[in-house]
UniProtKB/Swiss-Prot annotation:
Function as written in the Swiss-Prot or TrEMBL entry: Hormone which plays a role in endochondral ossification through regulation of cartilaginous growth plate chondrocytes proliferation and differentiation. May also be vasoactive and natriuretic.
Keywords: Cleavage on pair of basic residues, Disulfide bond, Hormone, Secreted, Signal, Vasoactive
Family recorded in the similarity comment: Belongs to the natriuretic peptide family.
Annotated signal peptide: 1-31
Tissue specificity statement from the Swiss-Prot or TrEMBL entry: Expressed in brain, but not in atrium or ventricle.
Subcellular location: Secreted
Gene that specifies this protein: cnp
Name the UniProt record assigns to this protein: C-type natriuretic peptide
Disulfide bonds: 134-150
Amino acid sequence: MSISSSSSSSSSSSSCLLLISLMLLAASCQGRPDLQHRNHKSQLAGLFGAEVAALLEDAGAADGSSGEEAALSQRAPPSIRALHPRSGRLGLRDDLEAEPPAENKPRRRLLKDFMSSRKMFRGRTKKMQQGRGCFGMKLDRIGSMSGLGC
């Protein structure tokens, strides 16, 4: 009997030791902020230009941006701040007041159309798409849609 009780006590002590070591390991591996991704907006502005940075900031302003985004816009590179020295940030209202160069107009318009079209299709549901006939639509075996008529 003493052999079985000693083996059970050693297994319980080893499980306690394992549990304590796991807790210490978890405490040492706490999450730390990634310093490389801290100013991602300035990196995007550097890669894709001022148009994308302006669209990102305007989308944040439309969604009710926080003070953190305002702080990020203050840390923008000097080339972006030079575009609008009075405010230090880019915005659609400022862009509409100041005419962009003719070469940037088509690109800016395409980006603006893409961003607004995404909002237009946001609320469509399955019920809204099925209202095409009195009795609905039918998918045939060959993959074509046919109305069931009135």
